[in-house]
């Protein structure tokens, strides 16, 4: 369920505790703690209010939005060398999003990013920055390094990777990378590239970035370029017709019955429908947005795996929660997963997760972005139980979702039938593609940023399941059905009542695991959700209604500005910066109409105006701006 972090899944906490973690994922099973290798969180964020007070920044308004953004980077850090990442775009709100990567001695600094948001008026709106500003090493030092095979072996040994390298050879490519041939144990050929990284102490290290996809983990390992036994940091990309299905909005079998839907796609979001990619029409669970199949052995092959085929396009199969074993309802499981993932794709598209923003599609139809990256949807995946995960590589490479069987009930329960799990997993793809730009899915790798990656998944899953008669007093537990526990898999259920959920910003001071941190973030977003619903009402339909580009109700408005905030925030943001990005997203979308509702929601949970981030001692605040008192 990580998009970019440890290859753990949905369940990482025992049911009623917040401090203890239950490790999961392949590397954890091999005794390797990837949390110890997280990249440092070094980003700053200058919100739109601060920009408005800086005349030097406001004067930058000549040329295209990319030109204006480039001038800002040069003005902010004149001595820096950098490149424009080729994934800039103008979103549906009119903001231009431009991403830069710092370079030193011709090499990328892999965790030194600068993102600039440019307003419709051609002026700087806000920006984030994690560029290195220390002493630049001599270019001659870039020639003093180990060979790439030594680096691959260093990563293999340190992380206990199941990759055999005895016959490995390295071949240089025209992209400045080395591709390894003769290895076994990885899903694709490993690669290595010489890059710098900024370490936790602020110094610079020359490293080999070794990429290995081993299924449960898809790793970028930063191996010291001189000492191959030293791994500085690690990023993990994994985080894990008619259709008879539980309808969208029904979270699990306890909430409703299955129904038959005809042609349920939204053509503006899926112009080829769900069962075509524009080149070929399919009679199975395959199309432009995803390909769903059974994967009982947990292997890496998917194209030739079993999926239901219906020449008359009737994907209607028997299922009830009492059926056992799970293989007796494989067709229904695959169909439900295919339906849920595609429906969410279409909803996110209407909210702004489009081709140019890095969404998951085979064909982008000349709408920008990189294609050939539908989501591989594995139902009843045999590589694990009681969990799920999602791997998010950069734009142009397929995402991968693994859905497991949950064994905490008799008979076992299939995670594909709990929509909240599917939504949570897919949201890792959303947040990783939007934060830092589609080509950089390494921007949710810190404890707080990774925690928010988990929290966004819970937030969207909860927002989608809201019912007509729900109020701000409604309480929802995460994955209660699959886990066979009314309290779900989080330390607390989502509630606006402190007696039910007491979490605040300073709770994070006692937490060291991303799912626990994510529960705090999702709790704050649940407060935001209800503040906006109380102000604007709630649309109980499956998609938003827009007026001048703004959702007319509070539920979809909250989902929209949270999504837009991901586009605006810096790489590896903390809670304070992500809060500011949501405020800025509302200002860009509505002119700041909901400023006080947003501030009040965050301040209730100690993320008010005086909140301060310090990774060891966060300061909470329940203060709001004077105009919101």
Swiss-Prot record:
Which residues does the annotation flag as glycosylated?
281, 331, 469, 617
This enzyme's EC code(s):
3.4.24.-
Q: Which GO terms of the molecular function aspect are on file?
A: metalloendopeptidase activity; zinc ion binding
Q: Does the keyword Glycoprotein apply?
A: yes
Record's subcellular location? Secreted
* Signal sequence residues: 1-19
First-listed, main subcellular location of the protein, grouped into a coarse class: secreted
Tell whether Repeat is among the UniProt keywords: no
Q: Which InterPro entries match?
A: FTP_domain (IPR011096), Fungal_virulence_M36 (IPR050371), Peptidase_M36 (IPR001842), Peptidase_M4/M1_CTD_sf (IPR027268)
Q: Where is the active site?
A: 425
Domain of life of the native organism: Eukaryota
Which keywords belong to this entry?
Glycoprotein, Hydrolase, Metal-binding, Metalloprotease, Protease, Secreted, Signal, Zinc, Zymogen
What is its cofactor?
Answer: Zn(2+)
- In this entry the propeptide is located at 20-240
An example GO biological process term is: proteolysis
* Gene Ontology annotations for the cellular component aspect, listed alphabetically: extracellular region
Binding locations of Zn(2+): 424, 428
Q: Cofactor stoichiometry and binding?
A: Binds 1 zinc ion per subunit.
Family per record: Belongs to the peptidase M36 family.
Q: What does this protein do?
A: Secreted metalloproteinase that allows assimilation of proteinaceous substrates and probably acts as a virulence factor.
Protein name (Swiss-Prot/TrEMBL): Extracellular metalloproteinase 10
Native species: Coccidioides posadasii (strain C735) (Valley fever fungus)
């Amino acid at each position: 369920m990580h998009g970019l972090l440890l290859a753990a899944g949905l369940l990482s906490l025992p049911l009623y505790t917040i401090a203890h973690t239950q490790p999961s994922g392949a590397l954890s099973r091999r005794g390797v703690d990837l949390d110890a290798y997280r990249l440092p969180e070094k980003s700053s964020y200058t919100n739109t209010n601060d920009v408005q007070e800086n005349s030097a920044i406001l004067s930058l308004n000549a040329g295209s939005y990319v030109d204006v953004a480039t001038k800002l980077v040069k003005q902010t850090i004149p001595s820096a060398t950098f490149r424009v990442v080729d994934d800039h775009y103008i979103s549906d709100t009119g903001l231009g999003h431009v991403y830069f990567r710092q370079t030193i001695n011709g090499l990328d600094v892999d965790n030194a990013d600068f993102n600039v948001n440019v307003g419709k008026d051609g002026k700087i709106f806000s920006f984030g920055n994690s560029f290195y500003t220390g002493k630049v090493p001599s270019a001659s030092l870039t020639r003093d390094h180990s060979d790439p095979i030594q680096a691959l072996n260093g990563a293999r040994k340190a992380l206990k990777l199941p990759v055999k390298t005895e016959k490995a050879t390295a071949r240089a490519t025209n992209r400045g990378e080395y591709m390894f041939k003769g290895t076994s144990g990885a899903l694709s050929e490993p690669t290595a590239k010489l890059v710098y990284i900024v370490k936790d102490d602020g110094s610079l290290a020359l490293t080999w970035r070794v990429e290995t996809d081993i299924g449960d983990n898809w790793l970028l390992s930063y191996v010291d370029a001189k000492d191959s036994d030293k791994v500085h940091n690690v990023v993990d990309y994994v985080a894990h017709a008619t259709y008879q299905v539980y309808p969208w909005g029904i979270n699990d079998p306890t909430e409703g019955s299955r129904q038959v839907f005809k042609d349920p796609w939204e053509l503006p979001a899926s112009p080829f429908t769900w069962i075509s990619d524009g080149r070929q029409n399919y009679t199975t669970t395959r199309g432009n947005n995803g390909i769903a199949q059974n994967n009982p052995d947990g292997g890496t092959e998917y194209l030739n795996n079993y999926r239901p085929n219906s020449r008359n396009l009737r994907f209607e199969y028997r299922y009830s929660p009492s059926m056992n074993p799970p293989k007796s309802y494989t067709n229904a499981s695959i169909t439900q997963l295919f339906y849920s993932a595609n429906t969410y794709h279409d909803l996110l598209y209407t909210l702004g997760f489009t081709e140019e923003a890095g969404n998951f599609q085979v064909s982008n139809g000349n709408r920008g972005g990189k294609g050939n990256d539908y989501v591989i949807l594995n139902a009843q995946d045999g590589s694990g139980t009681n969990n799920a995960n999602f791997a998010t590589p950069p734009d142009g490479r397929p995402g991968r979702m693994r859905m497991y069987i949950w064994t905490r009930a008799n008979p076992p329960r299939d995670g594909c039938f709990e929509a909240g799990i599917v939504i949570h997993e897919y949201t890792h793809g959303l947040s990783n593609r939007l934060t830092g730009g589609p080509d950089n899915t390494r921007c949710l790798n810190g404890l707080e940023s990774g925690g928010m990656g988990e929290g966004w998944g819970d937030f969207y899953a909860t927002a989608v399941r809201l019912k007509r008669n729900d109020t701000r007093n409604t309480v929802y537990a995460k994955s209660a059905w699959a886990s066979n526990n009314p309290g779900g898999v989080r330390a607390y259920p989502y509630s606006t009542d402190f007696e039910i959920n007491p979490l605040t910003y300073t709770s994070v001071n006692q937490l060291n695991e991303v799912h626990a941190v994510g529960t705090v973030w999702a709790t704050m977003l649940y407060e935001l959700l209800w503040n906006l619903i109380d102000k604007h009402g709630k649309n109980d339909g499956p998609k938003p209604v827009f007026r001048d580009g703004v959702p007319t109700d509070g539920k979809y408005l909250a989902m929209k500005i949270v999504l837009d905030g991901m586009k605006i925030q810096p790489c590896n943001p903390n809670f304070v910066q992500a809060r500011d990005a949501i405020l800025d997203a509302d200002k860009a979308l509505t002119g700041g109409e909901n400023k006080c509702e947003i501030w009040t929601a965050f301040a209730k949970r100690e993320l008010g105006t005086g909140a301060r981030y310090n990774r060891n001692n966060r300061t909470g605040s329940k203060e709001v701006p004077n105009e919101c008192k």
